[in-house]
UniProtKB/Swiss-Prot annotation:
GO cellular component, one term: Flemming body
Stored Pfam families: BTB
Sequence ranges of Basic and acidic residues compositional bias: 258-267
Highest taxon in the source lineage: Eukaryota
Signal peptide (UniProt feature, chain positions): none
Xref: SUPFAM superfamilies: POZ domain
InterPro entries linked to this entry: BTB/POZ_dom (IPR000210), SKP1/BTB/POZ_sf (IPR011333)
GO biological process: intercellular bridge organization
Species lineage: Eukaryota, Metazoa, Ecdysozoa, Nematoda, Chromadorea
Region of interest (Disordered), ranges: 244-267
Name of the featured protein: Cytokinesis defective protein 7
SMART domains: BTB (SM00225)
Organism (species): Caenorhabditis elegans
Length: 267
């Protein structure tokens, strides 16, 4: 895979009439820092005191927001400022959405950050990747739910609620949260979550309590029914035995008649 990317890189350099250099090396585990402008990455994204150079067409492919911003509203602008973020956060985000030459994989440490940016810039393909990653790991991690949210902090649930609050992945996360005791939730800073998520979690908790109560009542009803069946069976058996004994006794003559019969035989 890396060799194919390297060959592609050299072909691009040849197409732009630039001499290939031994300095151009594609390592198997390296990720670009986007600090240098190239003929195909001229668009500048500024954050704080750092600049990142990206392919605007790729941003437009991923994001309707950038497609409108860069090619409709401001087609001649060559710079975009991202605020409310740090340069390191922007760099991590770009590395996770761009093949330059390799795309950085999602991890439990960066998925919340990437999903937050993807929500902000309406990047549905990136949102889908993040959602799939969260769903796979939420179901495969330990059954210890507090351990789960040590790997997936509550920020992931917050980001998912902004992405698609009705998704199956969101349902999995809410179900996991509903299974955590209240005192453990407080240690996870649960109160900092959006109000609609908190309400959904507690609604799930209430429903769980009702379901458990219904199961206990159903179990008690089954035990009562089983006891009634046993009593009916025992009573029926007792009645049959009593009726049989009464029938046997009716066949034999009374004790007085037996003695009179014996005296007649001896005479």
């Amino acid at each position: 895979m890396s060799d194919n990317l390297s060959a592609r890189w050299h072909r691009i350099l040849d197409m732009t009439n630039r001499e290939t250099s031994d300095d151009v090396v594609i390592a198997r585990s390296s990720f670009d820092d986007f600090s240098q402008s190239t003929p195909w990455r001229k668009f500048e994204i500024s954050c704080g005191n750092r600049s990142f150079f990206v392919n605007p067409g790729w941003l437009a492919e991923l994001s309707p927001y950038f497609a409108d911003e860069l090619y409709v509203r401001k087609p001649n602008v060559q710079r975009y400022v991202i605020d409310q973020a740090t340069p390191d956060e922007v760099l991590e985000f770009l590395r996770c959405i761009t093949f330059c030459p390799m795309r950085k994989p999602l991890t439990v440490k960066n998925v919340s950050l990437v999903l937050t940016f993807a929500n902000r810039f309406e990047m549905r393909p990136v949102q889908a990747r993040c959602e799939n990653f969260i769903a796979q790991n939420a179901t495969s991690l330990s059954r210890d739910k507090t351990k789960l949210f040590q790997f997936f902090p509550l920020q992931v649930t917050c980001a998912m609620s902004q992405c698609d609050p009705n998704s199956s992945t969101m349902s999995v996360l809410v179900d996991k949260l509903a299974g955590i005791k209240d005192d453990e939730l407080s240690r996870l800073h649960f109160a900092e979550m959006p109000g609609d998520v908190v309400a959904e979690v507690y609604a799930q908790k209430i429903q769980r309590t009702k379901d458990k109560k219904a199961q206990r009542q159903a179990g008690a009803s089954d035990e009562t029914a089983a006891g009634c069946c046993f009593m009916q069976w025992a009573s029926s058996l007792f009645n049959r035995r009593r009726q049989r004994n009464q029938a046997d006794q009716s066949i034999l003559p009374p004790s007085g008649d037996q003695q009179h019969h014996r005296s007649e035989l001896h005479a």
